[in-house]
Amino acid sequence: RIAIAGVIAMEPECIVLDEATAMLDPAGRREVLDTVHRLNRERGITVVLITHHMSEAEDADRVIVMNDGTVAMDGTPCQVFSRVEELHAFGLAAPDTVELLYELRQAGLPVALDSLTVDQCADTICRALGAAEGK
């Protein structure tokens, strides 16, 4: 947190954070991510966030998955996280909401894998169950 404060004081155009939330408790992780989002929104600072936690990338404009030094996936969070099997092949997991929808799809419920928030996920499940009842 102190290192991030020092970088902010220099007023950069771009900040690169490599595993910035590693070793932080959930509250500390949220605080760092909120600060990063605020810097991007309010000051227009470009933020490159390097993380193994896919949930930290949910709010990004763009997600790039690297594998052995090459770009394996590149797109919006919805585009990348909906490719659950490919993420698994790289040893990564999609956000919990997408993983839940993926499991429901595997069980036969026709759901899209594009819900990143809990509310979106709940709406997707309710719509799918409502459609299934209507049959």
Task: Place the predicted regions along the sequence by residue.
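Conserved H-loop
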Residues: G44-I50
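Catalytic Walker B motif of ABC-type/P-loop ATPase nucleotide-binding domains
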Residues: I15-D18
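A short, proline-enriched helix->beta-strand linker immediately N-terminal to the Walker B motif
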Residues: A9-E13
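ABC ATPase "signature
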Residues: D74-G75
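Helix N-cap at the start of a conserved alpha-helix in ABC-type nucleotide-binding domains
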Residues: P26-G28
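ABC ATPase nucleotide-binding domains
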Residues: L87-K135
